[in-house]
């Protein structure tokens, strides 16, 4: 069906209410195939208001007399109200938005039509390939190699074409290990920690099943991991499921690594919620944050009952366990749950932020997102199909990536000088994960992105964020490089609600933006002052 067939009315007169303390905009409302536009007129500021229709999570419409109201609850947690002249126009616009905001076809989405000035197709897609990370690993150790056994995605559709595996294991053994792991997700290198000579790996669960099957090649691969580490190294398998859940998985074909089959490896269960419970926690938190008339006791009870901060605590605690085992005990770590595409990636990416100073730079953080989330197979299209307002029954939705961003925000709050990027970067990543003009978060894995030709037909988010006008909003002006590991506290007293995100629909953004700009101005003035001062040698008198 063509876009024009879904647009029931071309335009209407409307008034837009955008949020607290923001003046309403009145003008002509128009609908295109991908956007809702409001043009207030030549004298108004802004001169054009624009909303990507993919950002709409739910629509509510009311009619009274000869006018109507449409409330749009957006995936980025904003709530917008449109007061429209004419009942028929109101209903037609609501139906058009409903149809256009729920298109499922990837290739008809806006990134395939977005052509901004100053950007070229293909730019920035090559910034963070696995080969670049492998080169850094190869400078530190020769125990690993770059394998292209997955060149045609036949081993694992959710892995990239090239992955890093132990040098002592050939591609035929890798292929047999892939058949033994859920989704073909055989153990691959996620991070090499040079100070201790240990590694962080990720995988899917082993398919042992009720018969307790084994795979000699999979066992060989994990033996090679320990052999390639420092002498006497041991390993921990961090299973993000409870022991009971792991046993239940074995009855349906999954399972865990048998102790006898993997000597040198010890299994640790650190259960993390995923799927529907996590989505419901997110929904309850957003509902509580949107209620402006509740008492203090009611608010605190709802904040506790939604358990969102408990998920943050458990995630940070598990990431700290993995990082501490590598840094202080010299152990290798393998992380997996069931599929290995959700809580597994949470832990591997957070552990790297804790340990690796490079991951805390702007470029390093972008590489981390690309390598540990996009290329590692997090199913963004399924997980971010709806946000917290949708009335549709959740199927595959889960705010796993949001939970990661919240944990990173907690890191930034506890270590305000150690991250080169600021809250603006985290908010931008949240927004683009759910609705974006760029192609980075499209599809569910690399195979799908190749089939849709995402890299040749859409722009990379990283090219958009690298523009000078964006950098000031994304960078942390207080950043000071920190070569050490940063150890966050996961105690309840140390965790805070991420107000910049969860309260963005109920508090005006301007005070925060003004404060952020003021900090930048102070830092800029200080740098100018220091730059204009004479050096010690120049100020010393001559002989």
From Swiss-Prot:
Q: Which InterPro entries match?
A: Myotubularin, Myotubularin-like_Pase_dom, PH-like_dom_sf, Prot-tyrosine_phosphatase-like
This entry's Gene Ontology molecular function terms read: protein phosphatase binding
What GO cellular component is one of the record's annotations? Answer: cytoplasm
The alphabetized list of GO BP terms reads: negative regulation of autophagy; phosphatidylinositol dephosphorylation
Q: Which CDD domains match?
A: PTP-MTMR9
Query: What Pfam families does the record point to?
Result: Myotub-related, PH-GRAM_MTMR6-like
Tell me the ranges covered by the Myotubularin phosphatase domain, including all copies.
124-502
Query: What does this chain do?
Result: Probable pseudophosphatase.
The similarity annotation says: Belongs to the protein-tyrosine phosphatase family. Non-receptor class myotubularin subfamily.
Recorded protein name is: Myotubularin-related protein 9-like
Q: What is the lineage of its organism?
A: Eukaryota, Metazoa, Chordata, Craniata, Vertebrata
């Amino acid at each position: 069906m063509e876009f024009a067939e879904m647009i029931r009315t071309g335009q209407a007169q409307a008034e837009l209410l955008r949020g607290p303390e923001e003046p309403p905009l009145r003008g002509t409302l128009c609908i295109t195939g991908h956007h809702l536009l409001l043009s207030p007129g030549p004298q108004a500021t802004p001169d054009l208001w624009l909303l990507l229709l993919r950002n709409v999570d739910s629509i509510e419409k009311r009619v009274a007399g000869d006018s109507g109201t449409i409330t749009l609850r957006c995936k980025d947690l904003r709530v917008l109200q449109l007061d429209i002249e004419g009942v028929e126009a109101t209903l037609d616009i609501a139906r058009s938005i409903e149809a256009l905001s729920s298109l499922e076809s990837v290739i008809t989405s806006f990134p395939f039509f977005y052509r901004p000035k100053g950007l070229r197709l293909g730019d920035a897609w090559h910034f963070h390939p696995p080969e670049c990370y492998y080169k850094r690993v190869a400078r530190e150790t020769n125990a690993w190699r770059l394998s292209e056994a997955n060149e045609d995605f036949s081993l694992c559709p959710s892995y990239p074409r090239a992955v890093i595996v132990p040098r002592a294991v050939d591609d035929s053994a890798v292929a047999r290990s892939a058949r033994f792991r859920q989704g073909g997700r055989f153990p691959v290198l996620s991070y090499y920690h040079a100070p201790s000579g240990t590694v962080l790996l990720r995988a899917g669960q082993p398919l042992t099943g009720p018969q307790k099957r084994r795979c000699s090649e999979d066992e060989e691969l994990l033996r090679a991991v320990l052999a390639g580490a420092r002498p006497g190294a041991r390993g921990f398998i961090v299973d993000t499921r409870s022991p009971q859940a792991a046993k239940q998985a074995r009855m349906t074909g999954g399972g865990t690594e048998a102790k006898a089959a993997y000597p040198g490896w010890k299994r640790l269960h650190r259960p993390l919620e995923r799927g529907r419970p996590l989505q419901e926690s997110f929904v309850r938190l957003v509902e509580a944050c949107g209620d402006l008339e509740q008492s203090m006791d009611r608010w605190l009870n709802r904040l506790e009952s939604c358990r969102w901060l408990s998920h943050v605590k458990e995630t940070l605690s598990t990431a700290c366990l993995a990082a501490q085992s590598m840094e202080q005990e010299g152990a290798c770590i393998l992380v997996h749950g069931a599929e290995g595409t959700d809580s597994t990636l949470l832990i591997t990416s957070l552990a790297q932020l804790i340990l690796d100073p490079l991951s805390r730079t702007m470029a390093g953080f972008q590489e981390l997102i690309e390598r540990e989330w996009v290329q590692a197979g997090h199913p963004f299209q399924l997980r971010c199909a709806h946000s917290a307002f949708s009335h549709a029954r959740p199927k595959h939705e889960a705010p796993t990536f949001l939970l990661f961003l919240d944990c990173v925000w907690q890191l930034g709050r506890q270590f305000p000088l150690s991250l080169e990027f600021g809250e603006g970067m985290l908010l931008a990543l949240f927004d683009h994960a759910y609705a974006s003009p760029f192609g980075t978060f499209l599809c569910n894995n690399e195979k799908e992105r190749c089939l849709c030709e995402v890299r040749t037909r859409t722009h990379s988010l990283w090219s958009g964020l690298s523009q000078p006008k964006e950098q000031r909003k994304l960078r942390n002006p207080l950043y000071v490089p920190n070569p050490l590991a940063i150890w966050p506290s996961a105690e309840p007293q140390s965790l805070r609600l991420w107000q910049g995100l969860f309260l963005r629909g109920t508090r005006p953004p301007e005070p925060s933006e003004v404060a952020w700009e003021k900090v930048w101005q102070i830092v800029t003035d200080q740098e100018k002052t220091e730059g204009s001062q004479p050096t010690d040698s120049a100020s010393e008198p001559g002989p």
